């Protein structure tokens, strides 16, 4: 009986010890989602940081008298390119100058980037599905809102024409994306790389749950 009892106790100890041991495969399954979330979050934050220094919107003006064209690049805090010459040409049709100084959007852009980074961190660390979706939506709304804001500003200048200008044209709305033709000028407008990278960050954050689902056994 003593031998049987000791043997039984040995079996019980072995079972207890093995119960505390987590197989390597299980450990890998636990670590993999953390790595995926961390990598996607870092990549998204990197895209957002780069986007903060790139143009939000660009426009190229083409006309026979300008064989090299004219360029306009709108950043979060400034406008570069041939702004002076474009404003001089716009004066002939009574269009007000593109004056971006003092616009609320210009002052808020750094805050927008900070909010986007905070949303990216939240989307990665939260376990609540609704909160993750809300954070991803916040990042998606940034490029959409930026284009909508630029379109509104373009509508403003296109419908604020001076009736006493040397050349009178019908009020018009320049397109925020795509070509706009006025007299002998054709303007090609498109989103800047900043919005492309922000949309890429949003897509990356949104795809994390689907990636984890594919990786799960």
Question: Where in this protein do the model-derived segments appear?
Answer:
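Short, intrinsically disordered terminal tails adjacent to the first/last structured region
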Residues: 1-22, 101
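Cytosolic juxtamembrane amphipathic/interface segments immediately preceding
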Residues: 20-32, 183
């Amino acid at each position: 009986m003593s031998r049987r009892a000791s043997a039984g106790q040995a079996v019980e100890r072995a079972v207890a010890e093995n119960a505390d041991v987590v197989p390597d495969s299980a450990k890998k399954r636990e670590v993999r989602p953390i790595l995926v979330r961390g990598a996607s979050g870092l990549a998204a934050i990197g895209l957002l940081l780069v986007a903060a220094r790139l143009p939000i919107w660009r426009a190229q003006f083409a006309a026979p008298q300008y064989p090299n064209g004219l360029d306009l690049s709108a950043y979060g805090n400034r406008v570069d390119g041939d702004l002076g010459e474009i404003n001089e040409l716009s004066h002939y049709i009574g269009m007000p100058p593109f004056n971006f100084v003092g616009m609320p959007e210009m002052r808020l852009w750094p805050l927008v980037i900070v909010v986007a980074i905070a949303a990216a961190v939240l989307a990665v660390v939260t376990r609540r599905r609704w909160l993750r979706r809300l954070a991803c939506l916040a990042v998606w709304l940034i490029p959409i809102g930026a284009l909508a804001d630029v379109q509104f500003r373009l509508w403003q200048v296109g419908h604020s024409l001076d009736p006493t200008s040397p050349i009178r044209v019908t009020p018009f709305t320049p397109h925020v994306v795509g070509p706009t033709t006025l007299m002998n000028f054709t303007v090609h407008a498109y989103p800047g790389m900043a919005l492309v990278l922000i949309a890429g960050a949003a897509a990356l954050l949104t795809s994390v749950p689907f990636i984890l689902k594919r990786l799960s056994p």
